[in-house]
């Protein structure tokens, strides 16, 4: 097998999602090109991609996630990517969704070039993941259009992979689909738990944004602090970080704010002093697995979980945490050191069995062998 392949991500998720597809295609002797925009959608500034051979597509900058400028930027990316593909004429296309404009453009390209193999990888279910509220109600007509752009385009793909099985169920995907979980490398240092006995130590890891459920986290802290003193380690940052710190402190937690930490050994050191990781999002958020969950498991930290579907099943099957419910505070305050260590052991095993780069690479390789074998 040999040919040309294009991998596409508007928001530059090469490391999180596309690296495995790139490796798999190269193993099948495809030459690959990676296409992304020249605008960082998180920091809202232009950037230079460091992936070797990357082709960056110029788009209009924007500052607000809900704005006409963002819609225009995503539309430009979809149109300019398609124009590039007309010149490049690849044999295989792997595209991350959203943006949903990209799904529509690539579906049209597939109909025009039926011999190309098209794979959609859905890493976010937009607009379903938008937190509920007045804005979602007001924007529901627009959101329906956005969802239609994606849903009407999926049948054009030869294969659809999703971030979690929950997305497959919601989209009613069939046999030509499969969940491909987030991949991560094992931590470079061993976990050496040193859990405090005089207080309950919790960890929050990740972005502090509008989808985390600060009120429910604070309710948990408030209930637990009636039984034991509570310390909260925050590893991350975001637009709501001060609100989170203030609310957790008011609820009774001794808050230690570490800011964002990218060094795995440093994160391991902090988590070795924590009993549980917080995996609590707003109920309206449509997601079955978070990157923070994988990172908690990577470090051997059991979780307090409100996420349904995939993550809930992992808790039930492997005993790697406690579900967020009315008895949650009492449960986490009464769990013994031995029980916590057993959960930590299980969390590490789950990571090694389901989320290492080796495991995810095998999944991707199986998909590629099936989808491109006829080329």
Enumerate the language-model features and the residues they cover.
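N-terminal subdomain of nucleotide-sugar transferases
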Residues: 1-53, 159, 219-226
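Membrane-proximal helix-turn-helix segments that form the acceptor-binding/catalytic region
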Residues: 23, 79-83, 101-104, 108-112, ...
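Donor nucleotide-sugar binding/catalytic pocket of nucleotide-sugar-dependent glycosyltransferases
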Residues: 36, 119, 127, 140-191
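Acceptor-binding helix/loop patch of EC 2.4 sugar-transfer enzymes
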Residues: 61-69, 116-148
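Conserved donor-binding/catalytic core segment of Leloir-type glycosyltransferases
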Residues: 184, 193-212, 217-222, 232-233
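Nucleotide-sugar-dependent
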Residues: 212, 258, 263-269, 277-295, ...
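Nucleotide-activated donor-binding/catalytic signature segment of Leloir-type glycosyltransferases, i.e.
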Residues: 242-268
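A charged, aromatic-enriched C-terminal amphipathic alpha-helix characteristic of glycosyltransferases
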Residues: 327-373
